[in-house]
């Protein structure tokens, strides 16, 4: 079992895919900007040796020789080494192989039919499916992705996976509603939604987790971005989490970003297999508002599980100083009363920031955690 220092650090999810990866995957010769990006980042984080044939092919303008799969492997190695060079205690591959978090898992299941694109926000769309039959997993997913990370990671890997509530909430629920034909009302719709969530959890997420655990995956982050959309369904989020993880031998955390977390309590606390809440705090932390005051809830409900403390605002290019990160950690520790509860991370994935900004944010986060650690060590002495 890995031993961590006080205030260990982790990432949450995706980072931006480098220009050279996107061009290389398409089989295009790298332009001057991509070539500079490739060489400069390799000099900084050392993700490929000079003799690597994929690297040599990209540098020579022969992306097709590197192959799309080979370029994706390099992208995953780049993200791993960026996180590790920054000093993170838990890492993954920046979701280098993933494009989104909904369509791919749904395509691994029977019982869904894709209907068309709908807008998620601004000019972003996703292909939405309807649940049209009983859920059945065709094949466990993220296995090869995890195998690669496990083989190459120097720090402990933490795999992110989309949770059952979000997959259900982002889909149309035709099958389970149809089972209650002739019935009307909110209670029936809620029962149908509960059945949908649990069906996905038991028939798809759980067997996927079992397959991942069998391959050595010991730490899993279950992402539930939809949890804050319908606060009155927080109990369904918890029930889906429990149905997916019950009896499995791994450490499970839940990531929810940008929500009024108060509205999810106390129902969410019934997610009994959740050992860590990885949440957003920095985005709401301003001179006029204490973004960490909400941590009082954990003392109020006597919940002593770990807190993945968001200390980096992922929606702003402003780079938090180590002093700001340190102050946020120490403020949170004072509110919680137990510094040992805290893991340190960005609010969410850093994919909307440039690689340079994301990297500097992470470097400052790790340094801020180190300073906070030193402060508490001094107090103990």
What are the residue ranges of the model-derived segments?
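Domain-level signal for soluble alpha/beta catalytic cores
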Residues: 1-381
